[in-house]
Amino acid sequence: KYVKEILDYFIYTLHLTSMKFNLVRDNDHAPEQKLALYEEDVFWFANELMDYLQAYRCLGANFSEGNIEVRAKNLLQRSNMSCCISHGCQGGRKMVSFDHEGNIFPCEMIDFPEEKIGSIYEKDSIEIMVNKAAQQNKFFLPKKDERCKECPWWYYCQGGCSSRNRYLNRDGQIDEVECALNRSIYPRLIQEILNGNIS
């Protein structure tokens, strides 16, 4: 609702040059659940954000939003620089997380004991531990929906956040927020690239 005011504050009061919006997702465990955005809200937010970022660029502001910047690089460079939004969830593949006891998890957002990949005290290599976990842990289930079949953004998304799905017991389902963000941001980015506003 206050995208412009938030960006004005970050750019002109705090003099930030970059930031990243992480949208609150539907989450049964979080008291902030009423702050969660749903598909129509995500489309509105993404379009407002893109409009304001374009306006700030026209005013000469040196400011970027991290999720949009990564998606632009996905299109322009295929750099796969984000382990979350460049080629689907890469938790356990391009990143792992450790707890205070040396247990290894596929992502810092997941701590279910059944999702543990292994331990730093095991003799197996991380590759062997991940391969074993990928055969049995729900975190690694592929995510697909009927609309994914012909989605032009599937390469980048691949169903979205696996941790979110585990917390909501939606294993194998897509992350609706990530899907809506991709369907709203990528077409706008292509338009901006074709108009010469992003290079």
Predicted regions span which residues?
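Generic alpha-helix detector with strongest preference for long hydrophobic helices that associate
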Residues: 30, 77-85, 101, 132-133, ...
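Generic detector of isolated residues embedded in canonical secondary-structure elements
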Residues: 18, 48, 101, 147-150, ...
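Flexible mid-to-C-terminal extensions adjoining Fe-S/redox cofactors in radical SAM and related proteins
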Residues: 111-199
